[in-house]
Regions:
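C-terminal helical cap(s) of enzyme catalytic domains, especially alpha/beta-barrels
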Residues: 93-127
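Divalent-metal-activated hydrolytic enzyme cores
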Residues: 127-134
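Catalytic alpha/beta core domains of metabolic enzymes, predominantly
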Residues: 1-91
């Protein structure tokens, strides 16, 4: 976390307006211990602490964290439990012809399905929250 704080401080001291800055969590290099087989291991709690400490928007990159279509979808759904301000998801009409990151590119159909699932989860969560308040 100190590393993130130092980077934010350094960038802001260089004259960047805070309103033009956001943070992006892409996970951390897994090293040897990688039980989920992700390309990078996410630390969602750390990302939320940094969002709170810096008061900057925090987005999440499930594409580079997951490393494969199946894992991108899975980790995007996991990230939905946190208050990220957005997601960076690589989408290509023909992933096999993508110029980079071929294995983690979703098709438009997969992307639409993921968004629908995330939307349904959010609606269900809001409904449950409203019921609890009644």
């Amino acid at each position: 976390e100190k590393h993130w704080e130092g980077i934010v401080e350094h960038v802001l001291s260089g004259g960047i307006n805070k309103a033009n800055l956001l943070l992006c969590h892409r996970g951390f290099a897994p090293g040897i211990d990688n039980p989920n087989g992700y390309r990078n291991i996410p630390d969602f709690d750390m990302a939320m602490r940094m969002k709170e400490k810096t008061r900057l928007p925090m987005i999440f990159d499930p594409s580079h964290t997951g490393g494969s279509v199946e894992k991108v979808i899975k980790i995007a759904q996991e990230a939905d439990a946190y208050e990220f301000d957005g997601l960076v998801i690589e989408v290509h009409p023909n992933p096999k012809k993508a110029l980079s990151d071929v294995n983690q590119q979703l098709t438009w159909k997969q992307f639409r399905k993921l968004l629908k699932n995330l939307y349904k989860r959010r609606i269900k969560s809001v409904k449950m929250s409203l019921r609890a308040k009644l």
